[in-house]
């Protein structure tokens, strides 16, 4: 049996909701036209109206989701237009799910972090000279630790950390934890340069000369990208 493409489901779901919505409207109109408004009929009408309200809410939620996924895919295209459409969709969907799971991360901040961490490549297989791997540049030792929280069976650093879905799950969990401890600026500093330096920096009211030179450039670079993506519309 042929497996359905997730990209196809992305398009098909709103169509299903719309079809149900218009069918429900037809049923309501038919009921009003051909039946007396007895108590039983009014009760059924009320139930139908509630169902319609639920459908409208579902359509609204799905519309927001589709907007964010389309936006993320357009960002990916800027940096890596050779990534297959299904892979782009799956990455975008995982980023959106992470933004729902972690209230202190939004889609734009996650995308900004990935853009900078991957050196503007959005390549799932990218590796740094220091040994960090994947979209969110996770060190293998950190990956082993985070994999336990995500119920990911660790096989090898290459297999797990170059998997973009696993990488995003682990990276966003780690970033969210750091942001909850140190705020956005401090969380980004800790993600890049370690918690000790970030903690000292926050305690010193973000004074110059405490963070590593790389981290001093890293934090404002991601904040700039974050602002750019927040202002970006399709």
Regions found by a protein language model. Name each.
Residues 1-89, 227-234:
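N-terminal secretory targeting signals
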Residues 55-234:
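Catalytic glycan-binding domains that act on GlcNAc-containing polysaccharides
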């Amino acid at each position: 049996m042929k497996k359905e493409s997730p990209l196809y489901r992305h398009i098909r779901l709103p169509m299903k909701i719309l079809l149900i919505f218009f069918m429900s409207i037809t049923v309501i109109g038919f009921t009003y036209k051909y039946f007396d408004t007895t108590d039983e009929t009014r009760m059924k009408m009320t139930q139908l109206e509630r169902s319609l309200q639920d459908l409208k809410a579902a359509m609204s939620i799905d519309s927001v989701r589709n907007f964010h996924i389309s936006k993320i895919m357009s960002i990916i295209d800027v940096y890596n237009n050779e990534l297959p459409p299904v892979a782009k969709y799956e990455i975008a969907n995982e980023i959106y799910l992470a933004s729902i799971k972690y209230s202190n991360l939004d889609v734009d901040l996650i995308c900004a972090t990935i853009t900078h961490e991957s050196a503007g490549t959005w390549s799932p297989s990218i590796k740094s000279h220091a040994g960090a791997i994947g979209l969110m540049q996770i060190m293998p030792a950190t990956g082993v630790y985070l994999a336990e929280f995500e119920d990911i069976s660790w096989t090898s650093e290459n297999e797990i950390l170059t998997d973009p879905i696993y990488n995003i799950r682990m990276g966003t969990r780690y970033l969210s934890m750091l942001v909850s401890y140190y705020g956005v600026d401090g969380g980004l500093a800790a993600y890049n340069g370690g918690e000790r330096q970030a903690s000292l920096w926050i305690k010193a009211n973000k004074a110059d000369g405490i963070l590593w030179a790389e981290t001093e450039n890293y934090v404002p670079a991601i904040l700039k990208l974050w602002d750019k993506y927040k202002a970006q519309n399709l």
